[in-house]
Curated annotation (Swiss-Prot):
GO terms for biological process: leukotriene biosynthetic process; peptide catabolic process; proteolysis. Its EC number is 3.4.11.-, 3.3.2.10. CDD domains: M1_LTA4H. The keyword Metal-binding applies. It catalyses: an epoxide + H2O = an ethanediol. This is Leucine aminopeptidase. PROSITE patterns: ZINC_PROTEASE. Aminopeptidase that preferentially cleaves di- and tripeptides. Also has low epoxide hydrolase activity (in vitro). Can hydrolyze the epoxide leukotriene LTA(4) but it forms preferentially 5,6-dihydroxy-7,9,11,14-eicosatetraenoic acid rather than the cytokine leukotriene B(4) as the product compared to the homologous mammalian enzyme (in vitro). The active site is at 291 (proton acceptor), 380 (proton donor). The lineage of its organism: Eukaryota, Amoebozoa, Evosea, Eumycetozoa, Dictyostelia. InterPro entries: Aminopeptidase_N-like_N (IPR045357), Aminopeptidase_N-like_N_sf (IPR042097), ARM-type_fold (IPR016024), LTA4H_cat (IPR049980), M1_LTA-4_hydro/amino_C_sf (IPR038502), M1_LTA4H (IPR034015), Peptidase_M1 (IPR001930), Peptidase_M1_C (IPR015211). Zn(2+) binds at residues 290, 294, 313. GO terms for molecular function: aminopeptidase activity; epoxide hydrolase activity; metallopeptidase activity; zinc ion binding. The keyword Metal-binding applies.
């Protein structure tokens, strides 16, 4: 049983959804019905139970329009309401198919959906809609069995006002037009967990960026996006080489409006990304490697429950770093691993400080907990470290062969960690390596809170160069020997590490304003486009009290709404100029995604 869902796939399993919806921008609603096909898996099951959250259900019919009885449960504040639909008596035996149409509409409180007004878009001419269903928000878009343990196919028929375009995490199968609206149809033939259902509606244009890829965005950003993501096919090709053939057909990228609160979301066939990746020089294209790695880890082999999230994210980070290593030099794997370990350290400290240490176990107990509240780098980085440790026991070549085999064995399934463990043991016992792997303390790896129990040592000379520049040239020697050429040959990750090291190592004793001015005159950080540099540089300046950075910070805060940047920057600005932080937020809060504006308000004590 999935503790994050109220539904009953273990009794009556949903196999496909057919969404027939129209998009109403005036009311900020999706309206229509979903046809749910299900199959009885437990003899005598009387009801099909679906998850819903903040939906208005009007009625249920069978396919011949006869009414079907249903009721809604009491509301659970995190998991929503169960929609309990009576299965007709003749259809309650194992193997029988039950099809029901649920007529409903979403509401303004459906938190999977963000409705943007014209003014909140880049073009300012048309409204815009996008969804974010992970982890448990699909139930506020469509009544469904909203558990990653159950995979479904889906079709959709979406009516939108002209001249807007609809896209989904599915193959596009056509478009028909009437006087003032267009109908877009889609099909997703590969069963997916419901958190991967995605929709976007807006003034969208596309450019071809590869043999199976297009990039989509509002017209004003499409040329920049085309340039930035031109290397996408290389990442997919390395992924295929490492793992198995790419099965989804297309791999498109959707560049969202600036208020998209996340970095990226691996919706199948259509990765969603933030426009803060537009650096103008492809220096942030590596983020796409992560989303591409999800095409196998997560989207094909899926965590059965959210407590096993490391099966999605730990594996994805591992594959992402393998891809980056192959494309940018093997050292990049260790370099990124070292950075990741630092983030893991920070999060373990943070959760321990909040007395939530149990959430730092690789498989935490999420009973009654919103998976979003447990979110941290733990499943990503601790999961990654487990795989590095296992790799160190059996050797790189054999581990990569196992990984390929693991993906092909568990593709199209939802699994738990013990299945992964059992397959690892089975595979390497057969290969005569049972002694090497007998040392693994699986129980502690999976269940013990805190840092990884075994630590693989990562080595990166490039990281040392970046750290030395921060610690010796700038912190110790105050920049007296610094020159313009210091960072000329640095890779993106080195500049990020350089700035991170400065931030961390000067948190007690900030650099002086004079030192920062010198750094800026040599490296030109104030005017960079790269959002990762800008975010760190502004943090550093606020911390040192460099007043002239404040208007630049405001400019950055109101130009995008990615939580990774806006939350910490508002907090820093609030420390040095609370009036400016609060007035800026109050003036622009409607521009942010609802989740982001709630979080920032909390951070600012509003
Ligand atoms: Zn991910």
């Amino acid at each position: 049983m999935d503790p994050s869902s109220l539904s009953n796939p273990q009794e009556c399993k949903v196999t496909s959804l057919n969404l027939v919806l129209s998009v109403n921008f005036e009311k900020s609603q999706l309206q229509g019905y979903v046809e749910v096909a299900s199959q009885i898996v437990k003899e005598g099951t009387e009801s099909l139970i679906l998850d819903t959250n903040q939906l208005e259900i009007s009625h249920c019919n069978d396919v011949t329009s006869n009414p079907i009885n249903f009721k809604l449960s009491e509301e659970h504040k995190v998991f929503g309401k169960a929609l309990i639909i009576s299965i007709p008596e003749g259809l309650r035996s194992v193997g029988k198919e039950f099809i029901v149409r649920v007529y409903y509409n979403t509401t303004v409180d459906s938190n999977a959906l963000q409705w943007l007004t014209k003014d909140q878009t880049a073009g300012k001419l048309h409204p815009y809609l996008f969804s974010q269903c992970q982890a448990i928000h699909a139930r506020s878009l469509v009544p469904c069995q909203d558990s990653p343990s159950n995979k479904v196919k889906y079709q959709a028929e979406i009516t939108v006002p002209k001249p807007l375009t609809a896209l989904m995490s599915a193959l596009s199968t056509g478009k028909t037009e009437s006087t003032d609206s267009s109908v877009f149809t889609f099909t997703q033939e590969i069963p997916i967990p419901t958190y991967l259902i995605a929709i976007v509606v807006g003034d969208l244009e596309s450019r071809v960026i590869g043999p199976r890829s297009k990039v989509w965005s509002e017209p004003s950003m499409v040329a920049a996006a085309e340039y930035e993501f031109a290397n996408t096919e290389k990442f997919i090709a390395v992924g295929e080489d490492l793992l198995t053939p790419y099965v989804w057909g297309r791999y498109d990228i959707l560049l969202l409006p600036p208020s998209f609160p996340y970095g990226g979301m691996e919706n199948p066939l259509l990765t969603f990304v933030t426009p803060t990746l537009l650096a103008g020089d492809r220096s942030l294209e590596g983020v796409v490697a992560h989303e591409i790695a999800h095409s196998w880890c997560g989207n094909l082999v899926t965590n059965k429950y959210w407590s096993e999230f490391f099966l999605n994210e730990g594996f994805t980070v591992f594959v992402e770093r393998k891809i980056l290593g192959r494309l940018y030099g093997e050292e990049m794997f260790d370099f990124e691993a070292m950075n990741g370990l630092k983030h893991l350290h920070d999060d373990v400290d943070l959760f321990t400080h909040k007395h939530q240490e149990e959430l730092t176990a690789l498989i935490p107990n999420l009973n009654g907990i919103d998976p979003d509240d447990a979110f941290s780098s733990v499943p990503y980085e601790k999961g990654f470290n487990l795989l590095c440790y296992l790799q160190s026991l059996v050797g790189v070549a054999d581990f990569e062969a196992w990984l390929k085999s693991y993906i092909s064995k568990f593709s199209y399934q939802s699994i738990v960690a013990t299945q992964m463990k059992d397959y690892f043991i089975e595979y390497f016992t057969e290969k005569g390596k049972s002694e090497q792997i007998s040392v693994v303390n699986w129980n502690d790896w999976f269940n013990k809170p805190g840092m990884p129990i075994e630590q693989v040592v990562f080595v990166s000379p490039a990281a040392k160069v970046a750290k030395d520049l921060a610690e010796i040239t700038w912190i110790k020697d105050q920049g007296v020997n610094a020159t313009k050429d210091d960072i000329k040959s640095f890779k993106t990750q080195q500049i990020i590490l350089f700035l991170d090291t400065l931030i961390h190592s000067t948190s007690e004793k900030p650099l002086s304003v004079d030192v920062l001015e010198k750094m800026d005159s040599l490296y030109g950080f104030t005017d960079v486009v790269n959002s990762e540099y800008k975010f760190r540089w502004q943090t550093l300046c606020l911390h040192s009290g460099l007043k002239r950075i404040e208007p630049k910070v405001v400019e950055f805060l109101i130009s995008q709404g990615r939580m990774k940047f806006v939350r910490p920057l508002y907090r820093e600005l609030n420390k040095v100029n609370p009036e400016l932080a609060k007035s800026t937020f109050n003036k622009y809060k409607s521009q942010y995604h609802i989740i982001a504006s709630k979080m920032v308000a909390k951070d600012l004590g509003l």
